[in-house]
Structure formats: structure tokens, C-alpha cells
């Protein structure tokens, strides 16, 4: 008998049947129509308990990629989740505050019972991307995927297999999806020769690569947010923890830090953010992508008015002035020369110069410079929005320079200019994924080039690490718990033909809970468990609190869903490495082993894992605030930075060399100093005559990136809307709630307008993560910003310039 197809035309209705206290699925498929994915009416109500069994309350977590991991108390009756609440234990005092979930985590029941859950293994039929699948058994899936994987390795080598970026499950031990090297998929691949890995991530690519050239190492540390209690002034460049970290511990930490000393908070951002609402004293609107120009002008005032910390600069840095330039640096290449217009560009970085670029009045720039330099101490930090631009690497270093110039590095109440430290962590043992035999890496963003034109990808043209050039195209993609095949990637319309061509990338395996926009490109679509359907634990920390949430298996997996561990074990069996993969253990037995190891480091944990699951949450308070680079500040000779010089490298010889040896595209630049580089499609671009509005994105209460994007409860509470200033709306005849067309040369998206003075004129913002929902003409109908963004990687990090876009907006 021919197996039924799941198509966009012939949709089969889901039925929930309760038997023996467990949810089972009738032999039907969930809707897979792109048009239905986001429709509230398409989401089925959770089933009702059928019996009179006793209700249980079990601990679990919301472990998506918002920066917080929050506790859930899950009410279960007759094998059905009836209600989800959050942490309500203890007295909620500061230092041991409750790990309260936001509306997203509290909507977990709708996510569990969403009609878009993948019911069983599916195999593509027809053309890739067409949305046609047929049901197969797990045995068929394991066998065919194993054969495809072995064939790819035998034909092209292990570098042709890529683990794509996915952050749908973070913080857990067995089920985590990021970083790829920490996942069960990585363990499987490492047992059969390894895989092509990536570096950096979509959240922080430019700052991760760029800012270490200032401080050294692979990641620049910051003081804990709680240390802001010791600050006289805090200056947030694009940092919005009230929205990006609105749940868990951070909201209370931010409030406590702000009001303990009554620290003054200035927020520099194109938007009047929720952080401005909750803790801000003054909003300074700034045009996107111009933070480096503002930083240079602030430095100009500090230098000309002798407000800098000269002893700090002399002792801890190189490259500030001509006398401290490293050997081989050309004359006139110091930071001071650049700022004063004595360098190659001969342009003094005055407040008037910066005002034309940033839109900030010169007098306000002058005042801000004096405020920062005069505060004792000043907490200077940046979120990850400013760096997500075409030249964001330089922006990250330029903001960091303000902390360096004022000597606020390594002291209480100061900071490095980076984002605040994520907090203490508990030493919980993790699932061992073994060493990857393949050492080649590419950027998390430019993997599509390795499908389309791998021969052009070298160390100097594409940032390849581990070898001089790629030796194979990507032919096999693992996409576990991620929506970056398309939805979260830049240039969706340009990505589409690359993914459709199955002669280029021959196999795409999507392992997920939900039929996301990325799932339509799958050759094999495998249903994985949500964390409420398996045992695990989730650990995290924020400022002075570290914790672990023990995730109970609250219900049986819906349909035929399996844990990622069991999925990989099944494929490992086909490849002849199951014993090496499992070491004879089930997932729970692995957790017992890892828990026993964890108790050696944390003896206060309950004696058994079973008791830990009953307890639910373990917290530890660390009374000392974290001070980044304190040891370096106290004794730089004994505790040098991990930079080549051991000091803060204002002038970077390494970047000077890359500037000479790397091949860059027009509009791109790598500079030894943290200079302002105008962005193509930026604030002062000639293209603004045709596309007059700068488009950025922002994190949003409705979703964590794209996760929860199909939950209609959240869509009702926080609908997808384009933020537009009243001045720009009036000029276009747009009224609040109008459906508008947002477009440029890359794509079109339709969305409702939110007219608000909380965004500066000349700038519009779309909340990121909306599910791509194209109509028959290929136009997005759901406010998905990535049909408008670029597919062009940045110069140094080869990262995603998601906030460098010009668009036009008109009433639809």
C-alpha cells in the first residue's frame, strides 16, 4: 500500500486520543502548509484529561535561547499537561530570587500541543522545498540516513558534513543543540571521522571576533551586572536586558543594581527600549551603525579637555599615542593621531563631525564625554545589537575604548565596554562528545558559500580556519533544533535557490519538534522530544546566582518523537558505532553517571538523581560581584592579558597584517585601530535616496528568536508590528494598525504598523524571528525581516550584518 503524503494541498487532520494515561496520535499528519503555520485557528487546543487520576506537579524548564533558563512547575493529570506555572518557591529575596518564567515559558503547554508538532519520521518526495513528505518508520529513517551519511563521507570526506547552527534547546545536558560541538550529533560524527564545524554565533559574531583584538583571548569579559551597584553612572550602548533577558534572575538583578546606589543610567539606542522604561534616566537616540563615530567624538572631547586616565594608558595599553605604538607601526597610526585628525584621513573626530553621522547634537556629545570621564566609576557596556552591522567588529572595539580611555577596566563599578558578564556557573558534568578529528572551521554565517562555491573559500577570502582553503563542498547538513537554514539567516530570498538544489547539498536532515520554515527544505524530517518529554537537567547563572533545574519527564513523547540521544543512537547502530556511542547506557543511565560526577564538585546536591528531580531546583549565591580583568589591573606583569603584548592593544598589529593580506569586498575594511567605517546601506549612504529608512530588528516578547513563533496566545499579546516614528508614518499616509509594505531590492514583507515616538525618525524596526510566510508571489506576509537583510558576510568575522539595511515603507 502506498504511504500517505503530507502536502501543502492535502492536509490531514490531527487527532489526540488518550489511552492508558498517555497521549497517542492517530495515523494523521499535522498541517504543513506555510499559510497555516502561523494562523491562530490552526493551533489545536490541548487535550483534556480523560480520567480522575491525581494531579502531579513536576519541575522542568524553559531552555530556549533568550539568555535566561527559567523554572517551570508543570501540572500533569492522566498523562496530560493541564497547566504550567513558574517558580513560586522561597521568599524571593535578592540573592536567591525565584527563577520566574516570562509569558513564553508559561505558554509551554501550547508549544507542547501545537498542531505543528512533527508526528513521526518523514521523507521528502518530489522536489526539495515543495512541502511533500511521506511517512516512514524509524528503522527506515535510521537506515537511509546512515547510508546517505556513509556515502557522503566515502565520496567527499568528513569535511562535507556540516552541523548547522541551532539554538532551540540550550543549557540542557543531553538535549542541547548549541554549541554544535556539545551535542549528541557531534558525538556521533566524531565516532565516524568528524565534521565541518563553525565558529562564533548569530548573536555575537562581530563582537566575538573583533573585540578580542583589543583585549586578547577568544571572548572579552565584563563585570557582572550586579556590580553596577558600585557605579556612579552606567552607559548602555544598545544593551536592553529588560527585553533580551526579561525573565529568570536578571530583571531583579538589574533593578537591584540600578537602585542600590541610585546609579544614573544613560541608554544610547535607536529605540526607547524597555530597559529605558524600567531603569533609564536618559535616552540618546542614535542612527544604527554609527556607534564608532560617536565613540570617536567622545574620545576627541576627552583627549582635548585632558579627561583621560593617562597613567592607566601608559601602564596597560599599547598604541594610544605615537610613543606607545608597537614596532613596525607607521607614523601617524596611533589612536590619538586618528582622533585628532593627524592620521592618514586628516579628519578631526569632533562632535560636529560625529553629529552629521549619528544624528546626536554636538552639545550632547560634549556633555556625554564629560559625564563619562567624570563619573567615578562608570559602567560602560554594549549589547549585541550595535555589532550586528556590516562593520560591527570596529564598533565593538570603539565602544570598548571608552572604558580604556577612562581607566574603568578591572575595577569595581567599572567595566570593559563589553556586555555584562553572564554570571557564575555550577560545575555540572556534561555529556562527553569526544574530539572532532576535523579541524577546519568556517563562520557560522557563511556556510551557504560552502554549498554554492566552496573553491573560493580560503583563509584570506572567507575566514576559513584550520587550513588554507576548503577541500570539499557541504553535501550533508544536520539541522537540529534550529531555524537558521532560512528563517534566522540573512537574505532568505537569495538562500532559497541554494537550498532547493539537491545536486549541491545532497542531504538535509532536520531534527526538530515543530514544522518550522526551515523544515520545508528537509530530505528527512525527524521528530525530537521537547524537554518536558524527557529527563535532563538545565543549568545556568546570572550575576551572583548559579543554578540547575532538574527537568522531569512530565509526559510521554507525543506521536513517535524520540530524544536526540536515541535518534543518534539509532543512526550510530546503522553505522556500526552504537556501542561506542552509548557505552551501553540509556539516556537516564548517562544522567545518573553525570550526576554522580557533579556531586563530587557540588556535594550539597541530593544523594540521588531521583531526589534531585523531586527537589527541582538547586541555587547557589555568590556574594562577590565579578570584576573582569581585576588580576590584570592589580598586577599586569604577573597577570598579563592573553594578547600578544600582554596589554590592551589599541593598535592591533594582527589586524594591520590582516588588512594587508585579506581580500575584501567594496565597502569592507579591516583597520588596526577601532575606526569608524561607514556602512554600505548605512546612515550616510547615497542609497538612502531610493531606500530612505534604516531597518533594524529587535528582540520581542512574543518569541525567543523564532521559538514560540507559532503560539497564538503570544501572538495576541504581542502581535508582529513594524515600529515606525510618527514623522515617517505621516509622510507616507500611514496610520496605526495599517498593513504596510516594507521592501527593498532583496525582498518584500507585509506587516501592520506600530506608530510610536519610541523609535527615532529615519529608522524602522521589525521584531526578529517572525516565521517566514511567503505568498504565491514569493512575498512574505508575516513581517519576517530576513527577506530584507543581506547575504553578505562582514569583513573580519564573516558574520551576519542583520542591522545594516535600507528599505522603503508604504501603505499596502
What is the meaning of each model-derived region?
Residues 2-5, 178-268, 293, 403-521, ...:
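Extended redox/cofactor-interaction regions of prokaryotic respiratory oxidoreductases
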Residues 2-307, 361, 480, 730, ...:
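N-terminal export/assembly segments and adjacent metallocofactor-ligating motifs
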Residues 273-375:
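Long, well-ordered, tryptophan-enriched scaffold segments
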Residues 274, 517-550:
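Flexible glycine/proline-rich, aromatic-decorated loop/lid segments
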Residues 280-286, 546-557:
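Short beta-alpha connecting loops at secondary-structure transitions
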Residues 331-332, 336-452:
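Active-site phosphate/pyrophosphate-binding segments
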Residues 506, 553-572:
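Phosphate/diphosphate-binding loops
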Residues 563-612, 706-708, 712-723, 727-812:
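Long, contiguous, secondary-structure-rich segments that constitute the structural scaffold
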Amino acid at each position: 500500500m502506498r504511504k500517505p503524503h503530507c502536502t501543502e494541498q492535502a492536509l490531514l487532520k490531527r487527532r489526540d486520543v488518550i489511552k492508558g494515561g498517555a497521549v497517542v496520535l492517530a495515523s494523521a499528519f499535522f498541517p504543513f502548509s506555510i499559510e497555516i503555520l502561523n494562523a491562530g485557528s490552526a493551533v489545536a487546543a490541548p487535550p483534556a484529561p480523560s480520567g480522575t487520576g491525581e494531579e502531579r506537579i513536576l519541575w522542568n524548564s524553559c531552555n530556549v535561547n533568550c539568555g535566561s533558563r527559567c523554572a517551570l512547575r508543570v501540572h500533569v493529570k492522566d498523562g496530560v499537561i493541564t497547566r504550567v506555572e513558574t517558580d513560586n518557591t522561597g521568599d524571593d529575596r535578592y540573592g536567591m530570587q525565584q527563577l520566574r518564567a516570562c509569558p513564553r515559558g508559561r505558554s509551554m503547554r501550547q508549544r507542547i500541543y501545537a498542531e505543528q508538532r512533527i508526528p513521526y519520521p518523514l521523507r521528502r518526495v518530489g522536489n526539495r522545498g515543495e512541502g511533500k513528505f511521506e511517512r516512514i518508520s524509524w528503522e527506515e529513517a535510521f537506515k537511509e540516513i546512515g547510508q546517505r551519511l556513509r556515502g557522503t563521507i566515502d565520496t567527499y570526506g568528513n569535511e562535507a558534513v556540516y552541523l548547522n547552527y541551532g539554538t532551540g534547546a540550550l543549557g540542557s545536558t543531553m538535549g542541547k543543540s548549541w554549541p554544535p560541538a556539545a551535542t549528541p550529533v557531534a558525538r556521533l560524527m566524531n565516532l565516524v571521522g568528524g565534521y565541518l564545524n563553525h565558529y562564533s554565533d548569530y548573536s555575537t559574531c562581530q563582537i566575538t571576533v573583533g573585540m578580542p583584538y583589543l583585549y586578547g583571548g577568544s571572548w572579552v569579559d565584563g563585570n557582572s551586572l550586579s556590580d553596577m551597584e558600585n557605579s556612579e553612572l552606567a552607559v548602555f550602548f544598545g544593551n536592553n536586558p529588560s527585553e533580551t533577558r526579561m525573565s529568570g534572575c536578571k530583571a531583579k538583578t538589574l533593578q537591584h543594581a540600578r537602585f542600590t546606589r541610585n546609579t544614573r543610567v544613560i541608554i544610547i539606542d535607536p529605540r526607547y527600549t524597555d530597559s529605558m522604561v524600567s531603569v533609564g534616566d536618559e535616552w540618546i537616540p542614535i542612527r544604527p551603525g554609527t556607534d564608532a563615530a560617536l565613540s570617536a567624538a567622545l574620545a576627541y572631547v576627552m583627549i582635548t579637555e585632558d579627561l583621560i586616565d593617562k597613567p592607566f594608558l601608559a601602564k596597560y595599553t599599547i598604541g594610544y599615542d605615537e610613543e606607545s605604538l608597537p614596532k613596525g607601526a607607521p607614523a601617524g597610526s596611533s589612536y590619538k593621531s586618528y582622533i585628532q585628525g593627524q592620521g592618514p584621513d586628516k579628519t578631526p573626530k569632533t562632535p560636529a563631525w560625529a553629529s552629521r553621522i549619528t544624528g546626536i547634537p554636538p552639545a550632547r556629545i560634549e556633555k556625554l564625554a564629560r559625564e563619562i570621564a567624570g563619573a567615578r566609576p562608570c559602567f560602560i557596556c554594549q549589547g549585541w545589537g550595535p555589532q550586528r552591522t556590516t562593520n560591527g567588529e570596529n564598533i565593538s572595539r570603539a565602544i570598548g575604548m571608552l572604558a580604556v580611555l577612562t581607566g574603568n577596566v578591572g575595577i569595581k563599578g567599572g567595566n570593559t565596554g563589553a556586555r555584562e558578564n553572564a554570571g557564575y556557573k555550577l560545575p555540572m558534568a556534561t555529556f562527553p562528545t569526544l574530539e572532532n578529528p576535523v579541524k577546519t572551521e568556517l563562520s557560522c554565517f557563511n556556510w551557504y558559500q560552502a554549498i554554492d562555491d566552496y573553491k573560493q573559500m580560503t583563509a584570506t577570502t572567507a575566514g576559513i580556519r584550520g587550513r588554507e582553503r576548503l577541500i570539499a563542498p557541504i553535501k550533508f547538513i544536520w539541522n537540529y533544533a534550529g531555524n537558521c537554514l532560512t528563517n534566522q539567516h540573512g537574505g532568505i530570498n537569495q538562500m532559497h535557490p541554494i537550498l532547493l538544489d539537491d545536486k549541491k547539498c545532497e542531504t538535509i536532515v532536520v531534527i526538530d519538534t515543530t514544522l518550522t520554515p526551515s523544515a520545508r527544505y528537509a530530505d528527512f524530517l525527524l521528530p525530537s522530544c521537547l524537554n518536558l518529554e524527557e529527563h535532563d537537567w538545565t543549568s545556568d547563572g546570572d550575576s551572583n546566582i548559579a543554578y540547575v533545574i532538574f527537568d522531569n519527564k512530565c509526559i510521554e513523547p507525543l506521536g513517535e518523537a524520540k530524544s536526540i540521544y536515541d535518534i543518534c543512537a539509532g543512526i550510530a547502530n546503522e553505522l556500526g558505532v552504537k556501542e561506542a556511542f552509548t557505552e551501553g547506557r540509556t539516556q537516564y543511565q548517562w544522567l545518573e553517571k553525570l550526576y554522580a560526577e557533579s556531586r563530587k564538585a557540588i556535594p550539597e546536591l541530593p544523594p540521588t538523581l531521583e531526589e534531585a528531580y523531586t527537589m527541582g531546583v538547586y541555587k547557589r549565591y555568590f556574594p562577590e560581584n565579578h570584576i573582569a580583568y581585576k588580576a590584570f589591573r592589580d598586577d599586569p606583569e604577573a597577570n598579563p592579558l592573553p594578547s600578544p603584548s600582554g596589554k590592551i592593544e589599541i593598535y592591533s598589529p594582527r589586524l594591520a597584517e590582516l588588512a594587508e593580506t585579506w581580500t575584501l569586498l567594496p565597502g569592507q575594511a579591516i583597520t588596526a585601530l577601532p575606526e569608524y567605517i561607514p556602512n554600505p546601506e548605512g546612515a550616510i549612504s547615497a542609497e538612502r535616496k531610493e531606500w530612505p529608512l534604516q531597518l533594524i530588528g529587535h528582540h520581542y516578547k512574543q518569541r525567543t528568536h523564532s521559538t514560540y513563533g507559532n503560539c497564538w496566545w503570544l501572538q495576541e499579546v504581542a502581535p508582529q508590528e513594524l515600529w515606525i516614528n510618527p514623522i515617517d508614518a505621516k509622510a507616507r499616509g500611514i496610520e496605526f494598525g495599517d498593513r504596510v509594505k516594507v521592501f527593498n531590492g532583496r525582498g518584500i514583507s507585509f506587516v501592520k504598523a506600530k506608530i510610536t515616538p519610541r523609535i527615532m525618525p529615519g529608522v524602522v524596526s521589525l521584531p526578529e524571528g517572525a516565521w517566514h510566510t511567503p505568498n504565491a508571489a514569493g512575498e512574505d506576509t508575516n513581517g519576517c525581516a530576513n527577506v530584507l537583510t543581506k547575504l553578505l558576510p562582514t569583513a573580519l568575522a564573516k558574520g551576519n550584518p542583520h542591522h545594516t539595511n535600507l528599505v522603503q515603507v508604504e501603505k499596502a
